[in-house]
Amino acid sequence: VLSSKDKANIKTAFGKIGGHAADYGAEALERMFLGFPTTKTYFPHFDLSHGSAQVKAHGKKVGDALTKAADHLDDLPSALSALSDLHAHKLRVDPVNFKLLSHCLLVTVAAHHPGDFTPAVHASLDKFLANVSTVLTSKYR
């Protein structure tokens, strides 16, 4: 459960992420593909090289989805319903991959905003990403 302080930290963080969400999403995907090569199996049709247009486009989707989620903290299931259906029924992504991408997103945000990435902000963003992951995997059952 996100506390009011968590929600404030998330809103502040996304205010600073702002127009960089697509770039950060792509960077996090690249980190994930490099650090956890098994995740590449879900993207056999992608050019996974650095700066790839396909990775950038998917990074934008990730960034847009997280921004939407941050704007709907009190109703993540509704905000992410279509995405949850897609990942559960069509793409069939192993739920562990959401944790891997979440880790890479945290590293990316910390790298770009080291002064703002306090332990409290880290904890709030981690809880937020865990909640997003839970919603995205809720329709697997």
Curated annotation (Swiss-Prot):
Keywords assigned by UniProt, alphabetized: Acetylation, Heme, Iron, Metal-binding, Oxygen transport, Phosphoprotein, Transport
Subunit (UniProt): Heterotetramer of two alpha chains and two beta chains.
Entry binding sites for heme b: 87
UniProt record, GO biological process: hydrogen peroxide catabolic process
Reported function: Involved in oxygen transport from the lung to the various peripheral tissues.
Domain Globin residues, every copy: 1-141
An annotated GO cellular component: blood microparticle
Modified residues (Phosphoserine): 3, 49, 102, 124, 138
Phosphotyrosine: residues carrying this PTM: 24
Modified residues (N6-succinyllysine): 7, 11, 16, 40
Database matches in PROSITE patterns: GLOBIN
Tissue expression summary: Red blood cells.
Modified residues (N6-acetyllysine): 16
Example of a GO MF term: peroxidase activity
Entry binding sites for O2: 58
UniProt-listed Gene3D superfamilies: Globins
Phosphothreonine modified-residue sites: 108, 134, 137
Record's protein name: Hemoglobin subunit alpha
Pfam families, per database record: Globin (PF00042)
Similarity remark: Belongs to the globin family.
